[in-house]
Structures are given as C-alpha cells and as structure tokens.
Regions:
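Structural signature of tandem alpha-helical TPR/SEL1-like repeats
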Residues: 10-13, 44-53, 81-90, 117-126, ...
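Canonical positions in the second alpha-helix
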Residues: 22, 58, 93-94, 130, ...
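Short helix-capping/linker turns of helical repeat alpha-solenoids
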Residues: 25-30, 40, 60-63, 76-78, ...
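Hydrophobic face of amphipathic alpha-helices that form TPR/SEL1-like repeat modules
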Residues: 35-41, 69-76, 105-112, 142-148, ...
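Alpha-helical linker/edge segments of TPR/alpha-solenoid repeat scaffolds
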Residues: 40-48, 151-152, 227-229, 270-271, ...
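Intrinsically disordered, low-complexity Ser/Thr- and acidic-rich flexible linkers and loops
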Residues: 176, 228-229, 266-288
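DE-rich, low-complexity intrinsically disordered acidic tracts
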Residues: 402-447
Length: 447
C-alpha cells in the first residue's frame, strides 16, 4: 500500500497501521509516517484505539519511530496534565536513538521550557544537529523562525522563502517525493510581499501533498483575495470551505465561524427600525440561528486545537458578543485552554483578567502565566516577568530571566514608554466594553 497516497488522501489511521510493521526497512514508509507528524491538524485526528494504542505498544518495545510519534501526539494534543512530561520522556528516548526528527522535537522542549527548563544554547545545538541529519521537522522550525521571528528578533520572510526554495530544489534534484510543507511555507513567506493571490499555486500544491492546514489559506485567498476585509464568496471559496470542513480542517471551521460573524453583524441591523412583533420575532430567530452556527463552528475548531478559536470563544464570552451571554468565568476558561496550547494572545488576555481582578488567582499563577507568555514571544509578558522578578518573585527561574529576558528588557529599544512594547498595549488586549480591539491584525488575518 502506498503510504504517501494514504497521507495525501487523509487516511491517517490507515497510514499508521500500514507503516508501523515496515518502518525498519521501508524508507518511503518512514518518510510518509514522519510527515504525518508534521501536521497538527492530522495528528489531532488520529483515533486513539486505531492509532495511538498501537504506537504506545511499539514505543514500549523501544521502537524509536513510535516513541517519536507518541511524543508528538502528546505534545500537540495535550489532553492531560502529564502530556508534556510523557511527550518529553518519549522524545528523549527516540532522540537517544538518533532519530533526527526526535532531536528537533527535543530542541523545542528546551526552546520553550515545556519541561520547566529553557536553554536556548541546547535548543540551537539540537536543532542544528537534527537539520544536518536531514530532519524535515528541524527544517520547518528553521523556516518558522525566519517567518515569524524568534526570541524577540524581527521576522525575515525573505530568508524563510529562500530556505523553502532550497528545500524544494533539493528534493527535485534527488527525485524525492514532494514535501507539501516546503510549498506551504514558501507561500506563507511570499504572500505579504507579492500578494496572496500570487501564491495560490503553492498553497494548492501543499494541500495536494499532505498539508491539510492549507485549506484555511486557500479559503482566505479565494474569499478575500489580497484584501483582508471584503469577503467575496467565489465558487472556489465555497469549494475549499466545504472541503475543509468535510476533512475536519480546524482552520476551515474557524473561517466558517468568521463568515457567520459577519452575517450576524449584518443581521443585527436588519429590521432594527421597523415595528411589529412578526419582524422582531423573525430578526430574533435569525440571530439565534446565526449564534448557534458561530458557537458550533468555533467549538469544533477549538476541539481540533485551533488556538485562534479558543481566543475568539474567550472574546465572545468576555464581551457578550454574537449572541453569547457575557460570562467572565467562561471567557477565563476559554483563554486558559488557549494557554494550554501556547497561545500568546490568550496568555496576555488571561493575565490581564487576573491583573484587573476580574478573576482572582494567587500571584504565583499570575506570574506563571507571565513567564509562559515571555517564553512564547509576548513583549508585554516579558516586561511583567522581569518586573515580577525584580520584586522578588519567580526566583525559581533566576537563570532563565537573568540570562535571556533581562538583557532584552534593558535594551534601549525596549522601552516602557514605547507603545509598541508595553505602554497602552495592556488596555488594547481587552477593552472594558464594546467589541474586541483589533490591536495587531490577528483577527483580520483570519476573518
């Protein structure tokens, strides 16, 4: 059975079961198996009994591919309190057997302190070693570091595109089966520079070669073109939206929620100035139906580990928007779920709720959220982490804070008087009333 085709067709459980018995001898099965675990959307869809139980059984026998796969599932799914510890143990076991992707995965545990320890030098060492050994996961991390910036350094999308081009040229020269992620990240790196509509072919190629996340990007490209504000429901937009939902793409569910939110906004004005019980009832029923669709789509996306969906659910409860009942506790829970999955935006909003005593938690937890946010790249929460440390808290993270965060905080370009860094940002994260602030284009990028 062609393992690559199972990957491209989205038959992930079948791929696991086809590849596991032949991983030691079949290089194509190895590569297809490892590529499945490059996609969060694919990994969270794996059936526990059909795929995860066999992986656990093989991991316990010392199979390094199974150890790595089980570690990735635990890391991406995060279904329990011990998920990251289980992930680390299995990733370490696979890395000790020199599986390149496991070395890359281990690098990320040191990069972000998943096991409580941040060590950027160790992360760099492991990532470079994995990359030189041919790890595709390491290559993706290197591209993302250029694409989104790293350790509070600016993004370099042109270098991300350059590396993606090199990887595409290499696979063509070596006549390897295409990796859809190289096309995906080349498109991501180029879309702001040359326009979203000019990278559609790369996103289409990514989808063809096993990147389900590309559904969301194609929905945006065909629906919004090079504009993030005006939706035109073209036949291509509708096609990829429906196909994405059919294939359980988290981003497709989120995009359908975004479309329905626009419809809800329009419905709120419908019949507003007209009298009559019938008109009022019709408007109410239409708004209720729209709210139910928004709730359903956001919930589905969140269950598929879409952090933007957790943030949007939190916003809906926080503001009482789109027919949601205003509920601070539910907002807090939604943001907390986003934090479990490393959402910077959710960490900032959660921290502000506690800072403003909308939800009371002990100061240790408030500080813990701050240092998580600092690790993930929040300039606001880096500042709060350093301030907490200066006030005698977070002493268990002395080395991490003094080595990494103090120098950034003390740099001349990082000023508390600079709106882009800190001043004013706190109020923009969650305003006290009205609609969510579009502080940095996150919402427009999706909606």
């Amino acid at each position: 059975m062609n393992c690559y085709q199972l990957l491209y067709d989205g038959f992930y459980d079948a791929l696991i079961n086809a590849a596991l018995p032949v991983l030691e001898t079949d290089q194509d099965a190895q590569r297809a198996f490892l590529r499945l675990f490059l996609s969060k959307n694919a990994v969270v869809l794996l059936d526990f009994h059909r795929s995860i139980e066999p992986l656990i059984a093989e991991a316990e026998k010392g199979n390094n591919y199974a150890q790595y796969a089980y570690a990735r599932w635990q890391c991406l799914k995060r279904g329990g309190e011990n998920s990251l510890n289980i992930s680390y143990r299995n990733m370490l076991a696979a890395a000790e057997q020199n599986l390149p992707d496991a070395l890359a995965g281990l690098a990320m545990t040191y990069e972000y302190g998943d096991i409580g320890t941040v060590d950027w030098a160790k992360a760099d060492e492991l990532l470079d070693k994995a990359y030189l050994m041919g790890s595709e996961l390491a290559a993706i991390y290197k591209i993302k570091n250029y694409l989104f910036g790293r350790r509070f350094l600016p993004a370099q999308p042109e270098k991300a595109a350059e590396l993606a081009n090199e990887l595409i040229a290499k696979q063509e020269a070596e006549k390897l089966e295409p990796n859809g992620w190289w096309y995906y990240y080349r498109a991501s790196a180029n879309e702001d520079r040359i326009g979203r509509t000019r990278v559609i072919d790369d996103y289409t190629c990514a989808l063809e070669f096993g990147v389900p996340e590309a559904y969301a990007d194609l929905i945006i490209a065909y629906g919004y073109g090079d504009d993030t504000k005006t939706l035109v429901e073209t036949k291509e937009y509708t096609h990829y939206l429906n196909k994405g939902i059919e294939h359980l793409c988290a981003g497709a569910f989120f995009m359908d929620a975004a479309r329905e939110m626009r419809r809800y906004d329009a419905l709120e004005d419908l019949y507003k100035n007209e009298d009559g019980v019938q008109r009022h009832t019709m408007r109410y029923n239409m708004l209720l139906q729209s709210h139910n669709i928004i709730f359903s789509r956001l919930t589905h996306a969140a269950e598929l580990v879409d952090i933007a969906a957790w943030e949007q659910l939190g916003d809906c409860y926080y503001y009482g928007s789109y027919g949601f009942e205003k509920d601070i506790q539910k907002a807090f829970t939604a943001y907390s779920n986003g934090v479990i999955h490393d959402s910077v935006a959710c960490a900032e909003k959660l921290w502000k709720m506690m800072h403003n005593h909308l939800i009371d938690r002990d100061l240790d937890y408030v500080d813990q959220v701050a240092i998580w946010g600092a690790r993930w790249g929040s300039r606001l929460l880096l500042a709060e982490t350093v301030i907490a440390h200066q006030e005698g808290r977070l002493t268990e993270y002395d080395d991490e804070i003094t080595k990494y965060y103090d120098p950034i905080f003390d740099a001349p370009e990082f000023s508390l008087d600079n709106d882009e860094d800190w001043a004013g940002v706190l109020d923009d994260i969650l305003s006290d009333e009205g609609d969510p602030e579009d502080d940095d284009g996150r919402y427009d990028a999706w909606a």
